A protein has these predicted regions:
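Membrane-embedded alpha-helical bundles that form conduits across membranes
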Residues: 111, 116-191, 195, 224
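Conserved nucleotide-binding/hydrolysis micro-motifs of P-loop NTPases
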Residues: 1-4, 50-51, 76, 82-87, ...
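Conserved P-loop NTPase motor core
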Residues: 65-72
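Conserved phosphate-handling catalytic cores of large alpha/beta enzymes
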Residues: 83-114, 118-133
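Intrinsically disordered, low-complexity, charge-rich segments with an acidic bias
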Residues: 186-214, 218
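Conserved ATPase-coupling elements of RecA-like P-loop NTPase cores
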Residues: 48-63, 87-90
């Protein structure tokens, strides 16, 4: 995308030349899946997991390219924005007013060996947009006026924290099952004190909501 910051991070890494595709008078540069399979590196870094490949590609979506790489024994580090998760598509549309067309199936995320949340406060992300560190200037201005408004970013950040917390909970449940661990230590999560030793009144009225907020706070901090 012509970002100087990204170019600097790539220094010293082997870059696989893109596959050039001509489509409707436009030159597109796509990930060369066959070249990657031929080289068989131990690890590939690939951005934008939800990307739609150019017409004529072997797979319509980049996440399908990743699955083929994994099947061939090649490890992949990739990135995906929370708004591209299929399970959140309807919620994202309701909050932002934008229906995201490029999505990644939930199963792809669930099959990942590890998921790391890259958390950035909305104000910091907005500044990066203004500085041209996310999109080129023309694209950045359009993004700031539409999808990437501060209210939307706050909501998307919360969704990312919640989705990551859910994954941590699932991992904990598997660990408990495999190691026959009981749930007695969950009491610390189920009881939220207000500082005077009394549980928060709203949490008492809505215990399930209180527990969810506690899990979000507990696990959210753990993955930042």
């Amino acid at each position: 995308h012509g970002r100087a910051e990204t170019e600097a991070l790539l220094e010293g890494l082997t870059i696989l030349p893109p596959r050039v595709v001509e489509h409707r008078g436009t030159t597109l540069r796509e990930f060369d899946l066959d070249a990657a399979l031929s080289r068989r590196p131990q690890l590939i870094l690939m951005d934008e997991l939800a990307h739609t490949n150019a017409p004529g590609s072997r797979h319509p979506k980049r996440w399908q390219d990743v699955k083929e790489l994994l099947k061939a024994g090649i490890n992949v580090y990739t990135t995906v924005n929370v708004q591209h998760l299929e399970c959140l598509n309807d919620v994202v549309a309701q909050i932002t007013g934008v229906r995201v067309s490029e999505t990644v199936p939930d199963s792809v995320l669930e099959q990942a060996d590890d998921v790391e949340l890259i958390d950035l406060p909305p104000d910091d992300l907005l500044q990066r947009l203004k500085d041209g560190k996310v999109y080129m200037p023309e694209q950045a201005q359009q993004a700031l006026q539409n999808f990437f408004r501060k209210g939307n970013l706050i909501a998307l950040r919360e969704m990312a924290l919640r989705r990551t917390a859910e994954r941590v909970d699932q991992q904990m449940e598997v660990y408990r099952r495999d190691h026959a661990v009981d749930r007695r230590h969950d009491r610390a999560v189920d009881e939220i004190d207000d500082g005077d030793g009394n549980a928060d009144a709203e949490s008492q009225q809505h215990p399930e909501q209180g527990r969810e907020e506690a899990r979000l706070a507990k696990h959210g901090r753990a993955v930042l």
